[in-house]
Amino acid sequence: MKKYILIPLLILSNFVLGQDSITYKYNVDLTGSMNNANNNQQNNIVFSTFNSVNWKKFETGMSTNYQLMTTNKNILINDFTLRVQPRIIDKNYSVFTFGQLSQLTSKKINQRIETGVGGGITTFRTKYLENTLSYGVLYYDNTYVDPTIINSGVRHSPRAQFFGEMKNYKLKYFVECLYQPKVGETSDYILMTKSWVKFDLNKLLGIKLQYTTAYESFFATGATNDIKNFLVGLNYSLN
């Protein structure tokens, strides 16, 4: 049954595509870094996409994220995530549901399935800065390389976002913090942050500087549970 979790979300996507007066958004990021110290070389590349279809107050978004990190040609991270998120958006609130499928070799997880619901509000909006707060609840199931490890259940998922832009300087910025403690077991949690600054070169291309962190308190022996990335690259955006 697990493989059918995303089917209702894809059906909703097709419904939206069949309506009139729809708009599209397409966003691609290609960022990376290279380091060399005492002949020890580390390469890190992240490729992510976001596509959305909007009709009236309905939006269906699909995002992907792939990261490959190597040290002296040895693979440390080789992770991929696919997320589908339909939502209803108004000026000061949103209601959403989502399904997410991941393969996380860095964490020795063959497959992670997540599905949940939630809502968010806009707490303030100024010329240069906006803040949104959201809360969701999700069910997750991890399938580890080691089949003796079992970790599934329900997590809280509060999130805070700050973002804005300075149009005169062609500058956009974004900060996000996500905390996901397991229900009934707060020692098992996930903490992620993301912050970036983008300078638009033209209507389609921009230069992006990004810093992300991802920490998981529950992890398999030998897994990479604390990941930090500082990345520089290009952004392509079509609205």
Where are these regions (language model features)?
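Repeated loop/turn-to-beta-strand initiation elements of outer-membrane beta-barrel proteins
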Residues: 55-62, 92-96, 127-131, 165-173, ...
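Detector for outer-membrane/organellar transmembrane beta-barrel domains
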Residues: 130-181
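Outer-membrane beta-barrel "beta-signal"
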Residues: 226-239
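Membrane-embedded beta-strands of outer-membrane beta-barrel proteins
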Residues: 47-49, 82-84, 117, 158-160, ...
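Transmembrane beta-barrel strands of outer-membrane/channel proteins
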Residues: 28-34, 62-66, 84, 97-101, ...
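Residue-level signature of outer-membrane beta-barrel architecture
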Residues: 51-53, 86-88, 101, 121-123, ...
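Short glycine/proline- and aromatic-enriched beta-strand/turn motifs that initiate or cap beta-hairpins
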Residues: 19-61
